[in-house]
From Swiss-Prot:
<keyword id="KW-0732">Signal</keyword>
<keyword id="KW-0677">Repeat</keyword>
<comment type="similarity">
    <text>To NG-2, also to SGS-3.</text>
</comment>
<keyword id="KW-0964">Secreted</keyword>
<feature type="compositionally biased region" description="Basic residues">
    <location>
        <begin position="70"/>
        <end position="107"/>
    </location>
</feature>
<feature type="region of interest" description="4 X 8 AA tandem repeats of T-S-A-S-A-T-T-T">
    <location>
        <begin position="31"/>
        <end position="62"/>
    </location>
</feature>
<feature type="repeat" description="2">
    <location>
        <begin position="39"/>
        <end position="46"/>
    </location>
</feature>
<dbReference type="InterPro" id="IPR054054">
    <property type="entry name" value="Ng_1-3-like"/>
</dbReference>
<feature type="compositionally biased region" description="Low complexity">
    <location>
        <begin position="24"/>
        <end position="69"/>
    </location>
</feature>
<feature type="signal peptide">
    <location>
        <begin position="1"/>
        <end position="24"/>
    </location>
</feature>
<feature type="repeat" description="4">
    <location>
        <begin position="55"/>
        <end position="62"/>
    </location>
</feature>
<dbReference type="GO" id="GO:0005576">
    <property type="term" value="C:extracellular region"/>
</dbReference>
<dbReference type="Pfam" id="PF21827">
    <property type="entry name" value="New_glue"/>
</dbReference>
<feature type="repeat" description="1">
    <location>
        <begin position="31"/>
        <end position="38"/>
    </location>
</feature>
<feature type="repeat" description="3">
    <location>
        <begin position="47"/>
        <end position="54"/>
    </location>
</feature>
<feature type="region of interest" description="Disordered">
    <location>
        <begin position="24"/>
        <end position="107"/>
    </location>
</feature>
<protein>
    <recommendedName>
        <fullName>Protein new-glue 1</fullName>
    </recommendedName>
</protein>
Amino acid sequence: MKITVVLVLLATFLGCVMIHESEASTTTTSTSASATTTTSASATTTTSASATTTTSASATTTTASPSSSSKKKTVTHYKRKVKRPKKVRKITRRRGLRSRNGRRSDE
């Protein structure tokens, strides 16, 4: 029961943040996340989260001067591209009987 309340609150918060980000920004954002949990007799837990964000924006400004005899055009191009690497976090916990024997510092 407590977990479902927490999950609903988390989903609501993430929804509000995503709506706020989409309204505030006019750039293109691509995000992907994946999580994997594996538990066995040796109790190894692996959590992997990868996020890749690519942002690009471009603007073109054209200025013409009507007072001169020949038409002069100034075209300015702006282009920005940002790519961030994915982040991987790995947690390994050993709970087996063999690994407990190796942890004792008394003997």
